Regions:
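Left-handed beta-helix
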Residues: 168, 176-328
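Unchanged
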Residues: 1-222
């Protein structure tokens, strides 16, 4: 926390499992992401063969931004057809998870499934009430039903949007779906073919942070102040990598006060910080009071500012004497 972007978690999980040929299909507002990822060196993916491949929208069709995973995959069909790997793993980047893709692949191979999906037994997060898939699973682990925007309360089998399948199978499914004008991988391919395809599910019992909107981003950041959550997401032996930035250690000026907070390198604290997550290079000036906030990289909080339940973008300056307050 305080250093990482959402893409770091899935990308690091792949790197930790020995996956070194990764294609990231971006949709919009991706320039900052490309700057963050660079050549992929921090994830050991700056390679002559394979490595990190970033595919912008309009790569082939030049018509509109992708509406669903099928259109996104259709844009990299040529890339998929020229690869040599037998299997493909797919994941969205809107979850913070330290995932073992090798365990998913092993389960897939053992079951003989066409597609294997990772799921979590949990109540549907508030931010995903209108964007979720849940699974009905039989005693053998086979998916018998896939529901879209499940409205039921209580614990459900929530699809994590992490899949593994053979590359040739994926190519065939995408080509067939594209020919029929279909858009969504889960709704149009998996759900409609649940009785034809052999779809198996593997439960994930580790820590998952679902980031769907600003509220969930705020909540999930502050949850990491709890050491139990932090240790669950960042276990020893399975590191999360990110872009390197050479900063000095955080400096606490005499008279400053910091309570129950996570601060990245390069911060300078002269005021009061309570129950906050501060990214790299944040400066809190004398007399400023910052509570229950997530302040991104290089935010400057000037003297006598009061912040409560605020999320800032990077390079934001809050001028002296201002009072900003949100709600939890």
């Amino acid at each position: 926390a305080g250093r990482y972007r959402m893409v770091d978690f899935v990308l690091s999980s792949m790197a930790n499992c020995g996956i070194s040929n990764v294609s990231i299909v971006v949709r919009k507002n991706y320039h900052s992401l490309m700057d963050h990822l660079g050549t992929g060196r921090e994830w050991d993916m700056a390679r002559r063969h394979g490595g990190l491949n970033i595919v912008p929208p309009f790569a082939e069709k030049g018509v509109r931004i992708y509406s669903g995973r099928v259109e996104a995959l259709g844009s990299i069909l040529s890339f998929l057809e020229h690869q040599k790997e037998k299997y493909v793993v797919m994941s969205d980047a809107n979850i913070a998870v330290n995932y073992d893709f090798n365990a998913l692949l092993a389960a897939h191979q053992a079951s003989g499934a066409d597609v294997t999906v990772a799921y979590q037994k949990t109540e549907i997060p508030e931010g995903r009430k209108n964007d979720n898939y849940t699974l009905t699973i039989d005693a053998d682990g086979r998916v018998t039903e896939l529901l879209f925007n499940d409205y039921r309360s209580g614990v459900q089998n929530l699809d994590l949007n992490i899949y593994v399948l053979e590359r040739e199978t994926l190519i065939k499914l995408v080509k067939d779906a594209t020919a029929r004008g279909l858009i969504y991988f889960e709704r149009d391919i998996l759900a409609h073919n649940v009785n034809i395809l052999n779809i198996h599910a593997l439960e994930y019992t580790g820590y998952v942070a679902h980031v769907c909107d600003m509220k969930s981003y705020f909540d999930e950041n502050l949850k990491l102040i709890d050491d139990r959550n932090l240790e669950a997401l960042f276990p020893k032996g399975s590191p999360i990598y990110t872009k390197i930035r050479d900063d000095n250690p955080t400096r606490y000026v005499t008279g400053s006060k910091v309570v129950d907070s996570i601060l990245a390198d390069g911060c300078v604290i002269e005021g009061t910080v309570e129950n906050c997550v501060l990214f790299r290079g944040v400066k809190v000036k004398k007399g400023a009071v910052v509570k229950n906030c997530v302040l991104m990289q290089d935010t400057v909080v000037e003297p006598n500012v009061e912040l409560d339940c605020v999320v800032t973008d990077k390079n934001v300056k809050i001028t002296a004497g201002k009072k900003l307050s949100g709600t939890e």
